[in-house]
């Protein structure tokens, strides 16, 4: 017989699913910034970050560690805390300026010098929203950075929570479409021999 756990009634059940990030405002810390090309061939900055404070502190590091520990997964785990900023195309300047301004306002004595390496270890505020996607034939939800703000605005709760980004109904209908059986029996006359 095993020993009874003293605070058994207060223990929270852990089903191995881990904490799920929810929509809201978070204080984030930049771990690295890399200049890359998008799938469309456009220049972009990839901001690798993690959550720096609160209930979800180190959220992406924990996910990465857990994925690394999974010996049954042959795929190399990917860092999930990423924010993409295009450096060309329509309207990219405003989004880049919003991000840089958020970083400058969140880090005293920091001034952007056009060197992406200078962003490392800096804080910024991020507003995450829920986004739907399809995985293995089912609609799932994930949270991603929608916009950036200063750390102060996040701490003061001075932002609006965005609506969930839902998939178009026609995309959802494709995965819920009934299976149509197009099987036609083959007779001996249909055989090539």
What is each of the regions a protein language model found here?
Residues 1-193:
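Short beta-rich binding modules
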């Amino acid at each position: 017989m095993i020993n009874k756990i003293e605070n058994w009634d207060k223990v929270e059940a852990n089903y191995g699913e881990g904490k799920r990030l929810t929509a809201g405002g978070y204080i984030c810390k930049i771990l690295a910034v890399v200049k890359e090309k998008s799938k469309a061939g456009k220049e972009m900055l990839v901001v690798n970050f993690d959550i720096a404070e609160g209930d979800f502190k180190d959220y992406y590091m924990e996910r990465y560690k857990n994925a690394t520990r999974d010996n049954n997964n042959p795929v190399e785990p990917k860092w999930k805390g990423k924010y993409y900023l295009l450096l060309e195309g329509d309207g990219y300047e405003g989004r880049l300026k919003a991000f840089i301004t958020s970083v400058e306002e969140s880090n005293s004595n920091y001034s952007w010098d056009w060197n992406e390496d200078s962003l490392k270890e800096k804080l910024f505020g991020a507003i995450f929203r829920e986004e739907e996607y399809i995985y293995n034939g089912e609609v799932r939800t994930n949270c991603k950075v929608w916009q950036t703000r200063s750390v102060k605005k996040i701490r003061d709760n001075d932002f609006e929570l965005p609506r969930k980004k839902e998939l178009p109904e026609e995309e959802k209908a494709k995965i819920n479409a009934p299976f149509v059986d197009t099987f036609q029996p083959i007779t001996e006359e249909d055989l090539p021999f």
